[in-house]
Regions:
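Positively charged n-region of N-terminal signal peptides that target proteins for export
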Residues: 1-11
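Cys/His-rich metal-coordination motifs, chiefly Zn-binding "fingers/knuckles"
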Residues: 3, 21-22
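Short stretches within intrinsically disordered, low-complexity N-terminal or propeptide regions
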Residues: 14, 34, 52, 136, ...
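C-terminal motif of bacterial Sec signal peptides marking the signal peptidase cleavage site
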Residues: 16-19
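Beta-rich interaction/scaffold domains
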Residues: 22-84
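Residue position in alpha-helical solenoids
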Residues: 53-60, 193, 248-251
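C-terminal amphipathic alpha-helix
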Residues: 70-73, 77, 84-176, 180-190, ...
Length: 258
């Protein structure tokens, strides 16, 4: 009888040891998973640490970790990737919207520059005032032209004498409106966002078109700030820039339709 009781005690002790005999490695992983807590965009290191420790366990050691704890790690990984994706989406969309504003300012501004170029070469001698010039310069009023000319120390007769003065006057209007400042500010901010996306989220490779869009807009901005070539070349150059940008803008905009 004593022998039988002894066997029962040994068996009970073995069962107890099996239940409580979690290895040190498994215990460390369980604690690392519990340390994750509520998942946020700042949980990257704690989740990565717990995942790394879990991955190096043997199958036997992994089985020592409660199922609900293992599932908690999977849930944390999924939640972090979801939050990470939202951050990337938000930042990339912000960059796109800034570039889109730059595109719009360049297109409308270049329309005015083209009109001024045309007027200065072909119509200035037949005009009588800035009212005549405004008819060929879309989006800019005669009052704005007159105020810009005055700021530059020019008059309408200055346009008659030298067609390039028409360009200077329109560029002054755009400067007064703050278009050039907005363009520079937006391009700087968009570039910073793209740099951050590249450095911190380089695995999000589905945004290459956003970078292409940035490059295309940046090239147009350089031309917009200092248009060159003959008047005959001007229209083709504008069309080439704007057609390329329009296509990229459409492709990139599709990414942000949700």
């Amino acid at each position: 009888m004593k022998r039988i009781l002894g066997l029962f005690l040994v068996a009970a002790m073995c069962l107890s040891l099996c239940a409580c005999g979690q290895s040190k490695a498994a215990k460390t992983v369980e604690e690392a998973i519990e340390a994750i807590g509520e998942v946020s965009i700042d949980s990257n290191e704690t989740i990565a640490n717990a995942t790394k420790l879990y991955d190096i366990l043997t199958d036997s050691e992994k089985s020592e970790i409660p199922l609900e704890t293992r599932l908690a790690l999977l849930d944390a990984q999924a939640e972090f990737e979801h939050l990470r994706g939202e951050v990337v989406y938000k930042n990339a969309k912000e960059a796109y919207e800034k570039l889109k504003e730059v595109e719009s300012l360049c297109v409308t501004g270049m329309d005015a520059i083209y009109g001024a170029w045309y007027f200065g070469i072909y119509e200035a001698d037949d005009g009588y005032s800035f009212y005549s010039m405004a008819a060929d310069v879309p989006g800019i009023s005669s009052d704005e032209l007159e105020a810009a000319a005055s700021a530059l120390g020019l008059s309408y007769s200055s346009v008659e004498r030298d067609w390039q003065n028409a360009l200077y006057i329109v560029e002054q209007v755009l400067t007064t409106r703050g278009d050039y400042d907005t363009i520079s500010k937006n391009m700087t901010e968009a570039e910073k966002i793209l740099q951050s996306l590249t450095e911190e989220y380089d695995d999000y490779t589905y945004y290459p078109k956003l970078k292409d869009y940035f490059a295309a807009v940046a090239a147009y901005v350089e031309f917009y700030k200092a248009p060159s070539g003959s008047f005959q070349q001007l229209k083709d150059t504008i069309n080439n820039y704007e057609n390329g940008i329009r296509t990229l803008s459409s492709d990139v905009g599709f990414l942000f339709t949700k």
